[in-house]
C-alpha cells in the first residue's frame, strides 16, 4: 500500500487546473489498480504459507484511503494559484490530446537532477532557519556561529540544553554587547532554563557587561531568569543543610545588587539627575524560587531570611504557591505543628491565599504521618464543600491515611476493620471516576493497596500485588533496556526492587493470622477486585514464556495460600534474602566456607595496611568504616536494606512467637556500636605491636604462613580471626539504634525472656555513651529514654515483679512525665492483689506534675 504526503510544497512545477485534475484522476485510477494488483500478488504468495485473503473490509479501507487522498489533492489544487486563470473560470474540461500529454510529461521529466537536489537543499535550509528563528534571536545565532551546537542542543524542546550555548557565547568576542536589553531579556526569561551553576555565573556576568555594570538597568526579566535557574538547581550531598551554600550566597548577592540599585535610584532622584525609565522590581516568582531552593537544602534559617526580607524590604508577602512550598518544607522536616498553623493561615488570609488541591494533598500526607484519620476526613469534606476538584493522589492519600491509622487499636478507636474498608471504598471511587493519572500515581496506587492489604494481614493479596508490580517494572525495564539484559541483571534488579513494597510485604507476613478474614471478602466489589489480582498472580512458575531471554522469578512458595507459621517464616526469609542479594545476582548471605576463609585472608592483609599507614586510631577507624561502607554497596542492595524494613522483618518472628528465629535474625543483621569500637581498638593495638620484619608476604597468604610468622598463641590467633570476620560481616549488618533496642525489649516481653531483657538493658546503657546517641537532640533523647523505661515497666509487670516496676517509675519521676496510660497495666495488677500502698504511691506520681513543671510553678508564685 502506498502512502501519499499532501500539503503545500515549494519549488514544484505548477500545472493548469484542467491538466492537473486529469493527471490526478488518472494517477488515482492507475494507483488504485496497481495497489489492488500488488496486494493480490502478495496475498497469493502469502496464501501458500499463511492462507490469507483480502477481506471486503480491507478493500473498503483502501477505498476510503484513496477517496481521502483524492479529496485532499482536489482541495490543494483548488487553493493553489493557477498559472492559467481562464482555466479556473471554465465549467467544462476540454479533452486533452495524447500529444499534449506527452509534451507536458517530457517537460516535467527534463528537469536536471542537480536542480532537484538544489531545491531540496534550499527547502531543508529554509526550514532550519525558520525553526531557528523561533528558538534564538538572529543576533544570538550569529554570535554563537555554530549551527550544529544550536541544532544539537535546542531542536528537541523536551530535552533542550542551553549550557553549551551560553558557554559558547561566553567565549565569543561580543557576547551580549550592543543588543537591546529589554527585548532580549524578555526572550531570555521565558526560554533559557535549567542551567548548571557555572553557566548561570557566565550568564550573569554577560548580562552585567551588556548594561556596562549599571545595576539600575538590570531589569526584572534578568532577575527572574537568574533566580529561576538558581531555584532549579539541586544541593550537593555534602551540603544539605544550606550552610555556606554557593547557590544561597549567589541569591543573597543578587538581592544585595537589587538593594544597591534602589539606593542608586533614590540618590539620582534626590540629585535631580532624572528618574530612570523603568525601575526593576522583585516578584512573587523570585521569592518562590528562593523558597524552593531553601526547602531543598532543608534550611529553615535561609527560608525565614527570604520570607522576612521580601516582606519587610519589598512589601511582598508569600502567596498561595509560596505558602504551599513552606508547608511542604515543614512536612519533610517533621514540623507538623508549624505546617498546620501555616495551613490555617492560608484559609483565613484571603480567597487568593485559600489552599488548592496541592496544599490539601500535602496536609493529607501529614495526616498519614500523624495517623490522624479524623482530621483527614475533615479535610476531604472541606475539599468537597469548597468545590475543589480532587486528584488521583487525593484518593490515594485518603486510603493511605486510613491504612496507617488502622495499624493501632488505640489510634483507630477500635475500628481498624472499618477504617480499612473505608480506605478500599476511596480506591473504588477513584476507579469509577477514571481520573487522569501521572506516572508516579501507579506506584502510589499500588503502595496504597499494599498498605491496606498488609495492615489487614491479607498475605495472599499482598503477595499478588507485590508480584504484579515488580513483574511489570522488571519487564518494562528489560523491554526498554539498551544494553545486554543478561549482563546487566545487577543494574536492572537494583532499579526494580523497592524498599516500600518490601516493607509492606514483610508487614503482611508479620500480621499473619489464619483465623482472620480479609475485609475485601465482605462485599461484592471487594471480592471481585481481590479475585482479579489473585487470578493474575502465578505462584508456581513465574516465568515469562513469551521471551526466553527475560526470565522473571520471585522466591514465593509454590502454593496460593500460606496456612502455617513455618511457611510464613520460610517465605519471608527467601524474599528478604532475594532483595538483599539484589535479585539473586549476588551471594553475600549464602557464601561458602572457602569463600569466607578467602575473605578473612583478604581483609586481614587490608586491615594490616590500614594500621601501618594510619597516624592514629581515629584515622584507622575512619579507613575501616569507609571500607565497610564500600563492601556493603558492592555486596548488598542498599536501596532496600534500611532500618525501617529491617525493623519490620525482625517483628515477624516476634508476632509469630518464634524466639529462636528472632535471635538468629537479630544476630545476623545487626551489630552494636560499643562492640564495634572494642573490635576496632583490639585490631589496631594488635597490628601496631607487630614488627615490620614480621609483615607477611603480600602475594601469598596461607593459614600456615600466618601461624608461623606471628608469635601469638592459638587463642590470640583465633581472636584475631574472629575480629576480622566480625568486620567482614558488617557488610550485611545495621547498627542498633534506640528503635531496635525497643524492639528487642518488646521481644523480651513477648517471650518472657529475663536474660534477654537484662542484656538489652545493659547494651542500651552502653549505647547511651556512644557518639550516635549523644549527637541526638536532648528532647529526643529524653523521649527515647522514657519509652524504653515504659517498656521495662511493662516487662516487670508481666513477670509479676511489681516492686521493680515501681522502682523504675520512682527513680525517673523527676525526669519523665509518667501518664496513666503508661502505667495502666501495672495499676490494674496492683488493684488485683489489693496492694493499696503501692497503688497510692503510683497514683501520686501520675497525678503530680513533673519536677520541672513544679519548679516553674513555684517560680511564678514567688514572682507574684
Swiss-Prot record:
PROSITE patterns: PPR. Signal peptide: none annotated. Its main location: mitochondrion. It comes from the Eukaryota. GO terms for molecular function: mRNA binding; rRNA binding. Residues 1-76 form a transit peptide. It is found in: Mitochondrion. One of its GO terms (biological process) is rRNA metabolic process. Regulates mitochondrial small subunit maturation by controlling 15S rRNA 5'-end processing. Localizes to the 5' precursor of the 15S rRNA in a position that is subsequently occupied by mS47 in the mature yeast mtSSU. Uses structure and sequence-specific RNA recognition, binding to a single-stranded region of the precursor and specifically recognizing bases -6 to -1. The exchange of Ccm1 for mS47 is coupled to the irreversible removal of precursor rRNA that is accompanied by conformational changes of the mitoribosomal proteins uS5m and mS26. Belongs to the CCM1 family. This is Mitochondrial 15S rRNA processing factor CCM1. It comes from Saccharomyces cerevisiae (strain ATCC 204508 / S288c) (Baker's yeast).
Amino acid at each position: 500500500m502506498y502512502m501519499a504526503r499532501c500539503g503545500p510544497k515549494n519549488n514544484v512545477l505548477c500545472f493548469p487546473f484542467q491538466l492537473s485534475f486529469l493527471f490526478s484522476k488518472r494517477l488515482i485510477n492507475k494507483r488504485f489498480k496497481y495497489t489492488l494488483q500488488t496486494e493480490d500478488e502478495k496475498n497469493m504468495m502469502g496464501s501458500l504459507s499463511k492462507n490469507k485473503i483480502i477481506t471486503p473490509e480491507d478493500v473498503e479501507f483502501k477505498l476510503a484511503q484513496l477517496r481521502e487522498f483524492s479529496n485532499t489533492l482536489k482541495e490543494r489544487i483548488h487553493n493553489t494559484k493557477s498559472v492559467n486563470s481562464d482555466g479556473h473560470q471554465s465549467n467544462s474540461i476540454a479533452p486533452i490530446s495524447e500529444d499534449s500529454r506527452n509534451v507536458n510529461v517530457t517537460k516535467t521529466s527534463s528537469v536536471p537532477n542537480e536542480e532537484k537536489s538544489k531545491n531540496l537543499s534550499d527547502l531543508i535550509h529554509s526550514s532550519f532557519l525558520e525553526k531557528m528563528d523561533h528558538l534564538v534571536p538572529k543576533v544570538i545565532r550569529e554570535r554563537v556561529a555554530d549551527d550544529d551546537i544550536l541544532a544539537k542542543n535546542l531542536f528537541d524542546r523536551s530535552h533542550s540544553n542551553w549550557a553549551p550555548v551560553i558557554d559558547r557565547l561566553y567565549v565569543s568576542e561580543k557576547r551580549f554587547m550592543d543588543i537591546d536589553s529589554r527585548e532580549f531579556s524578555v526572550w531570555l526569561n521565558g526560554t533559557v532554563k535549567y542551567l548548571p551553576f557555572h553557566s548561570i555565573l557566565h550568564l550573569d556576568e554577560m548580562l552585567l557587561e551588556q548594561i556596562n555594570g549599571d545595576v539600575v538597568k538590570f531589569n526584572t526579566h534578568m532577575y527572574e531568569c537568574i533566580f529561576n535557574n538558581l531555584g532549579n538547581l539541586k544541593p550537593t550531598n555534602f551540603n544539605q543543610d544550606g550552610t555556606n551554600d554557593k547557590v544561597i550566597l549567589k541569591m543573597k548577592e543578587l538581592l544585595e545588587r537589587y538593594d544597591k540599585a534602589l539606593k542608586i535610584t533614590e540618590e539620582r532622584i534626590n540629585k535631580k539627575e532624572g528618574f530612570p525609565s523603568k525601575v526593576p522590581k522583585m516578584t512573587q516568582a523570585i521569592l518562590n524560587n528562593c523558597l524552593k531552593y531553601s526547602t531543598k537544602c532543608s534550611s529553615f534559617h535561609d527560608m525565614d531570611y527570604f520570607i522576612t526580607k521580601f516582606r519587610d524590604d519589598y512589601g511582598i508577602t508569600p502567596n498561595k504557591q509560596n505558602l504551599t512550598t513552606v508547608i511542604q518544607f515543614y512536612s519533610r522536616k517533621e514540623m507538623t505543628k508549624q505546617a498546620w498553623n501555616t495551613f490555617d493561615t492560608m484559609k483565613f488570609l484571603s480567597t487568593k491565599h485559600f489552599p488548592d488541591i496541592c496544599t490539601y494533598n500535602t496536609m493529607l500526607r501529614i495526616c498519614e504521618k500523624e495517623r490522624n484519620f479524623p482530621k483527614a476526613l475533615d479535610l476531604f469534606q472541606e475539599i468537597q464543600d469548597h468545590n475543589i476538584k480532587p486528584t488521583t493522589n487525593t484518593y490515594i492519600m485518603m486510603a493511605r491515611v486510613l491504612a496507617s491509622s488502622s495499624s493501632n487499636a488505640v489510634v483507630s478507636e477500635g475500628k481498624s476493620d472499618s477504617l480499612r474498608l473505608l480506605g478500599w471504598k476511596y480506591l473504588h471511587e477513584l476507579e469509577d471516576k477514571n481520573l487522569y493519572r501521572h506516572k508516579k500515581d501507579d506506584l502510589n496506587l499500588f503502595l496504597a493497596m499494599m498498605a491496606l492489604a498488609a495492615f489487614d494481614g491479607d498475605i495472599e493479596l499482598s503477595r499478588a500485588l507485590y508480584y504484579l508490580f515488580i513483574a511489570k517494572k522488571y519487564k518494562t525495564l528489560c523491554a526498554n533496556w539498551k544494553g545486554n539484559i543478561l549482563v546487566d541483571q545487577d543494574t536492572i534488579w537494583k532499579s526494580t526492587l523497592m524498599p516500600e513494597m518490601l516493607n509492606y510485604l514483610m508487614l503482611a507476613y508479620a500480621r499473619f493470622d489464619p483465623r482472620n478474614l480479609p475485609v475485601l471478602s465482605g462485599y461484592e466489589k471487594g471480592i471481585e477486585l481481590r479475585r482479579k489480582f489473585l487470578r493474575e498472580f502465578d505462584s508456581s512458575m513465574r516465568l515469562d514464556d513469551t521471551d526466553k531471554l527475560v526470565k522473571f522469578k520471585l522466591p514465593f512458595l509454590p502454593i496460593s495460600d500460606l496456612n502455617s507459621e513455618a511457611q510464613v517464616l520460610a517465605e519471608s526469609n527467601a524474599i528478604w534474602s532475594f532483595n538483599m542479594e539484589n535479585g539473586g545476582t549476588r551471594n553475600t548471605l549464602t557464601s561458602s566456607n572457602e569463600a569466607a576463609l578467602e575473605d578473612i585472608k583478604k581483609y586481614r592483609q587490608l586491615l594490616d595496611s590500614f594500621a601501618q599507614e594510619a597516624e592514629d586510631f581515629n584515622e584507622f577507624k575512619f579507613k575501616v568504616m569507609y571500607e565497610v561502607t564500600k563492601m556493603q554497596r558492592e555486596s548488598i542492595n542498599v536501596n532496600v536494606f534500611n532500618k525501617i524494613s529491617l525493623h519490620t522483618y525482625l517483628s515477624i518472628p516476634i508476632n509469630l512467637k518464634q524466639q529462636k528465629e528472632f535471635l538468629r535474625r537479630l544476630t545476623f543483621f545487626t551489630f552494636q556500636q560499643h562492640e564495634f569500637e572494642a573490635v576496632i581498638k583490639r585490631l589496631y593495638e594488635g597490628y601496631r605491636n607487630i614488627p615490620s620484619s614480621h609483615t607477611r608476604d603480600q602475594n601469598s597468604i596461607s593459614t600456615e604462613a600466618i601461624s608461623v610468622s606471628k608469635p601469638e598463641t592459638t587463642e590470640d590467633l583465633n581472636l584475631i580471626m574472629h575480629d576480622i570476620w566480625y568486620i567482614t560481616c558488617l557488610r550485611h549488618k545495621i547498627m542498633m539504634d534506640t528503635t531496635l533496642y525497643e524492639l528487642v525489649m518488646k521481644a523480651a516481653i513477648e517471650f518472657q525472656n529475663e536474660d534477654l531483657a537484662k542484656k538489652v538493658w545493659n547494651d542500651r546503657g552502653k549505647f547511651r555513651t556512644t557518639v550516635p546517641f549523644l549527637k541526638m537532640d536532648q528532647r529526643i533523647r529524653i523521649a527515647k529514654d522514657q519509652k524504653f523505661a515504659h517498656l521495662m515497666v511493662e516487662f516487670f509487670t508481666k513477670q509479676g515483679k511489681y516492686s521493680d516496676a515501681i522502682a523504675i517509675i520512682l527513680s525517673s519521676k523527676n525526669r519523665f512525665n509518667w501518664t496513666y496510660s503508661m502505667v495502666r497495666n501495672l495499676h490494674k495488677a496492683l488493684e488485683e492483689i489489693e496492694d493499696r500502698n503501692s497503688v497510692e504511691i503510683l497514683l501520686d506520681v501520675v497525678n503530680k506534675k513533673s519536677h520541672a513543671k513544679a519548679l516553674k510553678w513555684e517560680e511564678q508564685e514567688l514572682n507574684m
